[in-house]
Amino acid sequence: MDQLDLHLFWELLPLKGLGPIQFLSEKTDVQLYDKILGKIIAEEHENLEKRKQDLQDTVKQFSQFFSKEDLKIAIEALEETIGNERDDISTTFWGSGISLEYKADQLVEIFADDRAKLLHFQDIPIFSAEPIHLIGEISKQLNEIPLIKDEEVVFPKHHLFLFSFLSEQVDGQYCEGSKKNRSISWRNSPRTHAVNLADYQPLKLF
């Protein structure tokens, strides 16, 4: 791909995806971009039925220590923890700093860390721009006031989450966060088991 194509590829598109990769794309379609995304360095899978079976096998193996009631309680806890929303979830970690989460092999969330150096929002580099400028421009373009708590900035309507770009202070002010652990994620729908935003405060940038 030439530079223009790479620039278009690495554009963060809230509610839509990453460049040509749209939310709800099939995993096999996304893998066509492996030359840009880099090597797959790890994969994780969450499958409720498999976890149940693993639990049953463990209980059977150590039956002298566990009762049927213990198994029932453990499975109920597992169902509550994972639930239908987290069932059949897989995450692919790429060498470029991008992680892609799928539900039933359809893309539902994109995560990026500072290895994704070409990632940008409307020509503003995500990981090298001044955080206040970046978040301010995102706020303007999306016409949404972000919220902040500790080191997380959230654009709730656009399901966009920035971590460690800004840090909330005790006096209600904020300062630049640590560059070391900076990351960003975005979705086209609300997070499963979303954090209650009642404790988050509007971020006054202007």
What are these regions (language model features)?
Residues M1-F206:
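Short helix/turn-capping signatures at newly exposed starts of structured segments
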